[in-house]
């Protein structure tokens, strides 16, 4: 979850609502980690099963705005959390909630997207959810495309409800299809 200055106010509040919606759709057998980032990435909820949704939502709604945007470091910290518990029996995915305006650390769409592709080759998929008026479409779409995930944009959390549901349906159907093989 991007908590940088460019996400301050409404975009960050919408990102938190979006994250809470994701949690509401998860089951107790699912795993979740939450990473926030501005100029630094912080794992605010280490990877764990989704057993106490109320406690997870408390963590989500305690997120406050910060400084500049090291999107690369935030995404990478999220991917590392996924990798720690990667399993061939599960779908391993990073969901990035951001306006995509990287202005600190690695900012090259080409470099970041290439790394998304490398992780996809290792079975960790990246999907991006853009929020806010100044959404960096090029970076977010490129990350999702090379990361073999989906890319969506919305001004509000409500705008992203259908895409989130679509993503969850895709995950459930993909997992069920893989079980049949």
Give the ranges of each region predicted by the language model:
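Exposed acidic/Ser/Thr-rich ligand/metal-binding surfaces
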Residues: 1-180
